[in-house]
A protein has these predicted regions:
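Short secondary-structure capping micro-motifs at structural edges
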Residues: 1-4, 56-58, 90-91
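Short, flexible N-terminal segments of the mature chain
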Residues: 23-50
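A structural detector for beta-sheet-dominated domains
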Residues: 15-19, 55, 73, 106-108
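Short, intrinsically disordered low-complexity segments
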Residues: 42-81
């Protein structure tokens, strides 16, 4: 994971692909908030406090096809009120709406897969 330090906070560039024609979001992740879930990944790859887990993919593949990137952050920015909820709850809702069991996440040079 490519990580940089900014004003005492660890940040990394991240992209999440859900698909379904959502507008693109990408940018830095504040690892002091989101990264703690990634860093606390257990031996069976399950994460605490969320209902899906991340599976690390060693292959350096690009996110493509019809997938659209969403910014990985605690709350999504934007004028739409339904977007102002915890990020992972939003991801889970959208994945359910799109009938998708997984989405791809790119953090730095690493690609992860989110599975419900």
């Amino acid at each position: 994971m490519s990580v940089k330090k900014s004003h005492g906070a660890l940040k990394a560039s991240a992209i999440i692909a859900l698909g379904g024609g959502f507008p693109q979001y990408e940018g830095d992740v504040d690892l002091s908030e989101i990264g703690q879930w990634i860093r606390s990944e257990s031996i069976d790859h399950k994460l605490d406090n969320i209902t899906f887990f991340l599976v690390h993919q060693t292959c350096q593949e690009k996110l493509g096809g019809s997938q659209v990137a969403l910014r990985l952050e605690t709350h999504l920015r934007g004028g739409d009120p339904y977007c102002r909820k915890p990020f992972f709850s939003f991801v889970e809702k959208m994945m359910g709406y799109l009938n998708q069991s997984c989405a791809h996440v790119q953090i730095g040079g690493d690609v992860y897969r989110i599975e419900l």
